[in-house]
Amino acid sequence: MTQLAIGEATPHGATYDGHGVNFTLFSAHAERVELCVFDSRGNERRYDLPGRRGDVWHGYLAGARPGLRYGYRVHGPWQPAQGHRFNPAKLLLDPYARRVEGELKDHPLLHGGHDEPDYRDNAAVAPKSVVISDHYDWEDDAAPRTPWGKTVIYEAHVKGLTYLHPELPQEIRGTYKALGHPVMVAYFKQLGITALELLPVAQFASEPRLQRMGLTNYWGYNPMAMFALHPAWASSPETALDEFRDAVKALHRAGIEVILDIVLNHSAELDLDGPTFSLRGIDNRSYYWIRDDGDYHNWTGCGNTLNLSHPGVVEYACECLRYWVETCHVDGFRFDLASVMGRTPTFRQDAPLFAAIKACPVLSTVKLIAEPWDIGEGGYQVGNFPPPFAEWNDHFRDAARRFWLPRNLTTGEFACRFAASSDVFKRNGRAPGASVNLLTAHDGFTLRDCVCFNQKHNEANGEENRDGTNSNYSDNHGKEGLGGPLDLMERRRDSIHALLATLLLSQGTPMLLAGDEHGHSQHGNNNAYCQDNALTWLDWQQANRGLTTFTAALIRLRQQIPALTGNSWWEEGDGNVRWLNKNAQPLSADEWQNGPKLMQILLSDRFLIAINATLEVTDIVLPEGEWRAVPPFAGEDNPVITAVWQGPAHGLCVFQRG
């Protein structure tokens, strides 16, 4: 058998140098590692990796070229009680693979064994890693680096955003190419968003359970290869990387940042009954959190949890993030179930991964947004992430809904959430931008469904409506479903307007769910992770143009208010904010805690937000001076000048001092 040269322990993965390929694989507990390469007919040839430096195995294959398909067979103990599940009968993906050929099918040969090893060879059905050679001309690309105070995030799904867009060439709808097409760039600019946050684009798999039901994982939170782009949204697997980078480059030229939703908390290997295709077979004990009985700690709800306190896994995570920043020029990340990142196993602000990110000159300067919880004990960590992390603020989401979709909520609680939840985020030197305010996200009701449904309707997901949260704080305004008489539809419209204004005129970083500005509905499905169909795709031809115009005007208004764009905490008497009652007097202690939902918020001494969240029309006396209503609450050419606002029920209006 041809021997490999020893090669080098870095860089990680498979690296082509023009003459051959250097291969590396981290495994602290392996006893032997075989590199397996495949020709065009699927014939396999195996080579032992001859070198080992620390826990990294390595070797160099002279003459190997880009396009080579490969995998690993890793030898070591089968000791499930100790967390070791080595099985060389199973071909394994390189965790650093930049491209993957094949899908992760629901196939018995991909199972590595539960109590006993499954020694059936899986090479015929296993996905293969592919060597790539990377050259790309970024031209004069530069990161927009939008300040947090001016950032407006737009959360979208690559396919769902553009798949039904009639103005895009049909062949690129639902693809990476579409994201950077002039039609989409113009739309983003017209809307006024500054950052496009994409649901996972790293290659993912559909869970076996979904495959058996004829469904697919649509959202992408089931990662298979963290360094490889999901190929389904490209012209071909070979062109995916360049097509994605073309989109990033086009968005950057328009001043729009690109943020990736990334899943560094579990893998698609799932629980012990899931497929063995990579990490489990490479070094189960190092990559995952293992219980005393050898099973997984399931702090993610997905069957396994990555051990991001292990030095080798910390390095893997940081290399992954650096790859997306340096190779694809992305501007930041939103971390799914991010409390896992801080587990040691208890959550710590000085956890190894946090420390590594903070110390990295590449990663510490991009936008980092945590989903600050997981489902394990002590997993809810809102407000506890260290700088430079921002966090999703579920306090804001719930308070905004409870305020406008009648629930019990004090004026004081609403004001606190409006002021970037300083009680939660004003710590560790963080600024108001650390509070990422949202009304909705991919997970949950859309904004329109918040005003049309009291109950979730997830029957299409195949779990008899058991999945998805029951805590929606929604209000159907008297009739379940989308239709209804004119007065009901008007009340729903008013509620949507009030909610959007609250989101886009509050201190903190607003995040808008793609489609909410259209009136998109998922017909009450609040967990559409497996619905790759018209339920989730945005229907641009049915979009509510008036609502889109309203949303864009709110974003423009936001950018005019220094109190919102300055990204500094409001202090008493600093001119940023005054809290007034319906008579333009400072709110009393009783009004803060027990008063009706009537208030005025004066921002930067020039912009006044008048709020009537009661069920009755109420006169609100504006502060002394001349006030004119501003778009989208009045026309540019015909501003309404008034001293008293007759506030409609569930109404909100913004005025500017003349």
From Swiss-Prot:
One of its GO terms (biological process) is glycogen catabolic process. The active site is at D336 (nucleophile), E371 (proton donor). Removes maltotriose and maltotetraose chains that are attached by 1,6-alpha-linkage to the limit dextrin main chain, generating a debranched limit dextrin. Pathway: Glycan degradation; glycogen degradation. The keyword Iron does not apply. This is Glycogen debranching enzyme. Keywords: Carbohydrate metabolism, Glycogen metabolism, Glycosidase, Hydrolase. It comes from Salmonella typhimurium (strain LT2 / SGSC1412 / ATCC 700720). One of its GO terms (molecular function) is glycogen debranching enzyme activity.
